[in-house]
Amino acid sequence: MYYVSKRFEVSGAHYVTTDRRTKCEELHGHNWIVIVHCKSLTLNEDGMVTDFTVIKQNIMSRIDHKNLNEVLPFSPTAENIAKWICDETENCYKVEIWESENNKAVYEI
């Protein structure tokens, strides 16, 4: 089994509506740190599990410097964003996303 990881940063704004009133319901921004983990039993014709550039471009072009509530079809919590990134990335099995130094969400298949 081959394993690779790609780390990148994404800047964006969002708000999250909850049952209780919190500061997260106001539009605010993050500089997310994202690590995408991929695996494969075989390498593609280029000798890779997946192309790191394609991972970054596919995600960043859609959410970097955007209001995530306007561009994503779901509530943009860190957990939902992590799942979406994994679903959108070939051979992905795990995504880690930090909203801040102290807050991290992980989605793993």
Q: Can you name each region flagged by the protein language model?
A:
Residues 1-109:
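Charge-rich, low-complexity N-terminal segments
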